[in-house]
Amino acid sequence: MKDTVMAYLLENSIKFKGKPNPKAAMGKILGENPDLRSNVKELNEVISEVVKEIESMSLEEQQAKLDELAPEGLGQKTERKRKEIELKNVKGNVVMRFAPNPSGPLHIGHARASVLNDFFTKKYNGKLVLRLEDTDAKRVLPEAYEMIQEDLKWLGVKVDEVIVQSERLEIYYEYGRKLIEMGHAYVCDCDAEEFRNLREQGIPCKCRDTTPEENIALWEKMLAGELENVAVRLKTDIVHKNPSIRDFPIFRIERTPHPKNGTKYHVYPLMNLSVTVDDHLLGMTHVLRGKDHIVNTEKQEYIYNYFGWEIPEYVHYGILKIEGPVLSTSKMHAGILSGEYSGWDDARLGTLRALRKRGIRPEALYKLMVEIGIKQADVRFAWENLYAANKDIIDKDARRFFFVESPKKLVISGAESKKIDLRMHPDRNELGNRELLFDGEIYVSDDLEVGTMYRLMELFNIVIEKIENDVIYAKYDSDDLAVAKSNKASIIHWIPVKDSIPVTVIDENAEKIEGFAEKDFAVVNEDDFVQFERFGFVRVDEKEDNGYTCYLTHK
């Protein structure tokens, strides 16, 4: 492990002129060496040890050590071969579905199901159905119908057919009637609390033994709007070991106006009925769902068996544990309405729109979800892995610039004006150079101490003389990098005061970081990716006359 960590940290250190950045290296180490994820604690200890070793080396020694450990370069390392995930019992055409509720745009949790369904239907040349499950009017956000399709297009998910459940109510009525006629379902007017008490004891309610003819008459009254506080229940096993499976409801009365249907309908199917009917009629061969749906699978199998339908191949995967951003659609919507969040793409939210705004590329998210796969074990969503995958995509095109946050003015005496040329990208000469002109006054972001030597990146050494009225004064000391090393001088980045460009960076907590970028930052355009050296990758969101607004993508 140590040699692997050493190689990555050396590469990182050389990129930053001899000073390793362990946080930046961590994501890449885990992204390219997933076997180390299971021992992050030991990995952190090794990183701390290796950082101390690297900091004691000169830049030349670091390069020599890296050449020894990775003579062909880390970029040439052959990637670990992953066993591609597969479906069981593939016979002929594969048909699958992604079935969100249109209560808002898609978030990271939705990405797993949509990506995996897309991956398999592409792998087997199958068909993917987008089914919008909108039979609960209280949970429907009208604009979400389009937002979901836009999100899937951005993510690279190819939808072959779109189904909206609220447009299929007559179909559900037909199969509800059949279940009643066959004696497998009944209309129940029991008080909810009363039924719950009986169910817990495994005792049938008074409605269970009514005849199909009596239930059809009640069903017709339900459809005509003549009944309230009733439900249609499916007959299952009244003493089933799981009380929730005992005679569960499949239709209910709902008076809330529907965004698509208004008040035309007031009998709506519950999920287990509508899902089963749709999965059969649409020819689903495989159904991917979280293991929290195992009970629903058992409920739906009752309906399959009553109709004599073929049951699709179910795949139940583990829970994806996502820490950090807000994922609750209701909380997000409430926060937007109250003004707490700026919109569905607020950086604090876990929506795909927020990730897109921050600069996460869809290819990176897609790749990570395929890697997470369909394992039954619960898995933690590793942000560092997403960032590593994203960096692999954007790094090659991201031009480099200096950015000084919370800028402090530094006036240097005893040094002549000097122009330095830096490459826009360390590996791509064709992106050209950028120019920094030192003329005595610069901005820095570090808190500097009087009497201490510092090295200005790519420039020279200075010693701080005094700090007055928030202005730092220093004198030129020397050009030699060896002098800085012998004095253990910190290396700080800087930009000239003259022609500096105001930049606001919005981080993942929606906090605004104010600062200045160098003058050549003016060449970038909206939606470009750049790397602010020693700060992180950012996506340029707005370019205006008075400055730029960027979003922090990741370190």
UniProtKB/Swiss-Prot annotation:
Disulphide linkage map: none
E.C. numbers: 6.1.1.17
Keyword Aminoacyl-tRNA synthetase attached: yes
Matching InterPro entries: aa-tRNA-synth_I_CS, Gln/Glu-tRNA_Ligase, Glu-tRNA-synth_arc/euk, Glu/Gln-tRNA-synth, Glu/Gln-tRNA-synth_Ib_cat-dom, Glu/Gln-tRNA-synth_Ib_codon-bd, Rbsml_bL25/Gln-tRNA_synth_N, Ribosomal_bL25/Gln-tRNA_synth
Pfam families: tRNA-synt_1c (PF00749), tRNA-synt_1c_C (PF03950), tRNA-synt_1c_C2 (PF20974)
PROSITE patterns assigned to the protein according to its UniProt record, in alphabetical order: AA_TRNA_LIGASE_I (PS00178)
GO cellular component: cytosol; protein-containing complex
Main enzyme class: ligase
GO biological process: amide biosynthetic process; glutamyl-tRNA aminoacylation
Cleaved signal peptide residues: none
Keywords: Aminoacyl-tRNA synthetase, ATP-binding, Cytoplasm, Ligase, Nucleotide-binding, Protein biosynthesis
Location in or out of the cell: Cytoplasm
GO function term, MF aspect, one: glutamate-tRNA ligase activity
Keyword Nucleotide-binding: yes
Positions occupied by motif 'HIGH' region: 100-110
Matching Gene3D superfamilies: 2.40.240.100, HUPs, Ribosomal Protein L25, Chain P
Catalytic activity: tRNA(Glu) + L-glutamate + ATP = L-glutamyl-tRNA(Glu) + AMP + diphosphate
Subcellular location, principal: cytoplasm
Domain of life according to the entry: Archaea
Family membership noted in the UniProt record: Belongs to the class-I aminoacyl-tRNA synthetase family. Glutamate--tRNA ligase type 2 subfamily.
PANTHER family (alphabetical): GLUTAMATE--TRNA LIGASE, GLUTAMINE-TRNA LIGASE
HAMAP family xref list: Glu_tRNA_synth_type2
Main function: Catalyzes the attachment of glutamate to tRNA(Glu) in a two-step reaction: glutamate is first activated by ATP to form Glu-AMP and then transferred to the acceptor end of tRNA(Glu).
NCBIfam families registered for this protein in UniProt: gltX_arch (TIGR00463), PRK04156.1 (NF003169)
Full protein name: Glutamate--tRNA ligase
Lineage per the UniProt record: Archaea, Methanobacteriati, Methanobacteriota, Methanomada group, Methanococci
Name of the gene this protein is made from: gltX
